[in-house]
A protein has these predicted regions:
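Short, acidic/polar
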Residues: 37-53, 98-104
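Solvent-exposed, non-membrane alpha-helical residues enriched in polar/charged side chains
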Residues: 5, 9, 43, 47-50, ...
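Non-cysteine beta-strand/loop elements that form the S-adenosyl-L-methionine
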Residues: 14-20, 139-143
Length: 255
């Protein structure tokens, strides 16, 4: 947040800043130490984000707890409504892959988006249906499949022990025992030629698929280098895939 705030300060009126809350974070050690969605914590976390971002308001404040029961989320949303009234945030969203949660959040006046996992090898038609029917933004987490859709990794690739992809956590679907899953690599190989058409890199093709998937999609690819940033931005010059290409991809992946 400090880096983003400093970089965007001269352009604040021209950009939309989104951030998340619920993970308790130690700024000194840079470690997550817990999870808290109490009204007191939400307000404190918002103030801390405003300070780090060096801004008077947050455009989109996102609940980063996809498994929170809907019975418990109303108190969260009520607190967020108060922050909207106070001018601290403009709107809010739920980061969740659960369709019912997305539909529930859509009943709130200040919810304008859902952040969820979506990419060319892992479509989410039910989620997209909820998002489109409620005129929400679809903010796409893992648009490049945690790196698999960059083409940099093969079945024999390994990761540093500090890399989360080596952790073998249950939700790490694209990787098995710290290595790229053959299942997902095979899917990518089957559609590579379509994604890399018209001079696109594989990553650019994956972003082009998302733009063609729905008018509501907003992919948020991670970047670590200037080169990755330029590659992702370059995808905009080539635009979305065509309807014919989208149909071909769907046919291949469903066979």
């Amino acid at each position: 947040e400090q880096v983003v705030g400093k970089a965007l300060k001269p352009y604040r009126q021209d950009v939309v800043i989104a951030t998340k809350f619920s993970n308790v974070f130690d700024e000194e050690t840079r470690q997550i130490t817990g999870n808290d969605v109490s009204p007191e914590y939400i307000r404190a976390a918002c103030e801390a984000s405003l300070r780090r971002l060096d801004t008077d308001y947050i455009d989109l404040y996102q609940l980063h707890n996809g498994g929170l029961p809907t019975d418990d989320v109303d108190a969260v949303f009520d607190t967020l409504d108060d922050l909207v009234t106070q001018g601290k945030i403009r709107a809010y969203a739920w980061s969740t892959d659960t369709v019912d949660h997305a539909a529930y959040s859509a009943t709130r006046d200040h919810v304008i988006a859902v952040q969820h996992r979506l990419n060319v090898i892992e479509d989410a038609p039910d989620m997209i249906n909820v998002i489109e029917s409620n005129d929400l933004a679809s903010i796409n987490r893992s648009p490049l499949g945690m790196g698999l859709l960059t083409g940099k990794y093969s079945a024999g690739s390994t990761f540093d022990a500090k890399d989360i992809r080596a952790s073998n956590q249950e939700w790490m679907a694209y990787f098995t025992d710290g290595k790229p899953s053959a299942r997902w690599l095979d899917k990518i190989a089957s559609i590579r030629d379509i994604l890399t058409s018209e001079g696109r890199t594989l990553a650019q093709g994956a972003l082009a698929w998302l733009w063609a998937r729905s008018e509501n999609t907003i992919p948020i690819p991670g970047i670590r280098t200037i080169e990755q940033l330029e590659e992702n931005a370059g995808a905009m010059e080539k635009g979305a895939l065509t309807s014919v290409q989208m149909t071909e991809i769907q046919s291949i992946l469903s066979s």
